[in-house]
């Protein structure tokens, strides 16, 4: 009887631990789905040198422009004017379909905080006959020659990589970060605060008879 009770306790304990390590997100859909971001914000700010973000929908519009149209914001400053709660939907790492999207301007958090953000990866390649796969996860996919300053991600933010990738031959490029997954060129992070978690299962399963080169990197700024 004691042995049965002990086993039951152990099963319950392991179940609780599993929930703590790999909790399930409640969000449905992406911030980049039509209707979830403010298209008018893009039209109003297209020619502005300083682009002000005050709502989650405006924040999503900024990301959607990078993700869908490779709008890289060169010579522009994107500035928060309020705390932003991003808990309504998931944030797909903005890299666009060709993985050519990156941010090259100034992102000024102005001391404000992003909360409730759940980042999920963008993926490219990795089919049965494909010898290359790229997985990128972060608020920014890639920053290039950019400046990110006075930005806080609070403890309710998270980067989730819930999938195990089966990859048996070639090159796997895996970049996971919080504020940014990848930085290129002269990039500066100034007075940024990160309290976000990176939550992941084992991410790679390989075969026995093939060769793999795996690159894993990322920025927790």
Question: Where would I find each of the regions flagged by the language model?
Answer:
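Bacterial N-terminal signal peptides that target proteins for export
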Residues: 1-9
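Terminal non-domain segments
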Residues: 7, 25-26
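C-terminal segment of classical bacterial N-terminal signal peptides
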Residues: 15-25
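Surface-exposed repetitive/solenoidal architectures
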Residues: 26-221
